[in-house]
Regions:
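Extended, low-complexity cationic-aromatic segments
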Residues: 1-87
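Short, basic/hydrophobic alpha-helical segments
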Residues: 80-101
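Short mixed-charge
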Residues: 119-136
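RNase H-like two-metal-ion nuclease catalytic core shared by retroviral integrases
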Residues: 56, 105-106, 134-161
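Acidic/histidine-rich, metal-coordinating catalytic segments
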Residues: 97-111
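Mobile genetic element proteins and their domesticated derivatives, centered on retroelements
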Residues: 20-22, 61, 86, 105, ...
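C-terminal domain-tail junction helix/linker
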Residues: 32, 173-222
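Active-site proximal helix-loop segment of RNase H-like, two-metal nucleases, encompassing DDE(D)
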Residues: 69, 144, 152-170, 184-188
């Protein structure tokens, strides 16, 4: 936990941007019946029944101090998908920086091995492509059960409230909606003012220790 908090306390450096990454599944939902249109004095009426149109995955990147944002939609959440997103991060979003300081959770696909799986040595792909991408990164993982430390999780929550508070029935429409949302976020360069600091950690740890001890005592009495 201290490692991630120390990263968040680093001063802004455009040559060493701190970027947070996260992903979430999304359920594509269609209307079982056509909604009744809005009328004067009445909101649009939407039936409670819906049609499941499968799932997809949303990947999000946010630079808290620089205000850069990127979201993408993929049909799956595999090592290949993650590797391609990381290549986009390195080669399109930050092609000229010295190092990208990347914060993310410790998901099984969020590993250097995923890059080597996607970009193996071949006649088409250079032998050192995966290594080249990895050398651009300085990775910091959030601890187990500590995904709340990933600022990209906050970004996904904001995105859900602002853009995904209605049914979207297919990937094409979802991509259009999120693309428009991304443009807006980048236009205003929305930044994140992270307040939780390393100096507050002992107090939080003490509270967690007290809570766990109280829970164990309750379980023992029961």
């Amino acid at each position: 936990m201290e490692d991630v908090l120390d990263v968040y306390e680093l001063p802004y450096n455009p040559q060493r941007p701190v970027v947070c990454m996260d992903e979430k599944p999304y359920q594509l939902l269609g209307e079982a019946r056509s909604p009744l249109p809005m009328r004067p004095g009445n909101d649009q009426k939407v039936d409670s029944e819906y049609v499941r149109n499968g799932t997809c995955s949303i990947f999000a990147f946010v630079e808290p101090l620089g205000g850069a944002h990127h979201v993408s939609v993929r049909e799956h959440r595999t090592a290949i998908d993650w590797a391609e997103e990381i290549k986009y991060l390195a080669d399109v979003m930050y092609p000229d920086v010295e190092k990208i300081i990347l914060v993310m959770d410790n998901l099984n696909t969020h590993k250097p091995a995923s890059l080597y799986k996607r970009y193996p040595c071949s006649a088409i792909i250079p032998a050192d492509e995966a290594r080249r991408i990895m050398k651009r990164l300085e990775i910091h993982y959030t601890p187990k059960h500590g995904s709340w430390l990933d600022i990209a999780e906050i970004e996904l929550n904001v995105m859900t409230r602002q853009c995904l508070n209605r049914r979207i029935d297919n990937i094409s429409n979802l991509r259009k909606e999120l693309s428009a949302w991304e443009v807006e976020r980048n236009t205003v360069a929305a930044k994140v003012n992270w307040q939780f600091r390393t100096v507050l950690l002992p107090q939080v740890q003490k509270q967690l220790l007290f809570r766990n001890s109280a829970q164990k005592l309750t379980n023992w009495k029961n």
